[in-house]
Amino acid sequence: GGFTHIAFNSIALYFFGPVVERYLDTRRFTALFFGAGIVAGLAQVGSTLLTVGPFGPGVVGASGAIMGVLGVLTVLNPGLRVYLYFIIPMPLWVLTFGFAGFSIVAGFGAFGGGLAGGNVAHLAHLAGLVIGLAYGARVKGNVGVPNSQEFGRGGGGMGGPGGPGGPGRGP
């Protein structure tokens, strides 16, 4: 938890969100984001109630929503080149499943914090990812995915700066 966690969520949404929104559309992106966040948050709250009781840490679900976005993008464009920490190049699927593996080990492994996860909602991450992967598989044949994607412009979503209809671009 904490500021660093919020910062990484914000960075991920800034870079991945507009790309997924372009693939889906604003309405479906919004439904995915809130749906994955709500389901992920409920999964984490349920597991916390079962393992720690009613006095466990609270959860917002934003990480699950971000992982849902990442899951959809991984299904739609698994080979998309991304940069871990803005330095290490890798295909998106490696980043996604590497992060999922980390959440499994940190949340459930011998050195992890259990389902409470040391104030990180690891089950929410995983639940959001599963929702995103499933939704991506469902819409894969119905959305246009370009062979290559100009990536890293962030904020270029529908109507945003650099996006279709946004400032600096034609309609």
What are these model-predicted stretches?
Residues 1-171:
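A detector for small-residue-rich transmembrane helices and their helix-helix packing motifs
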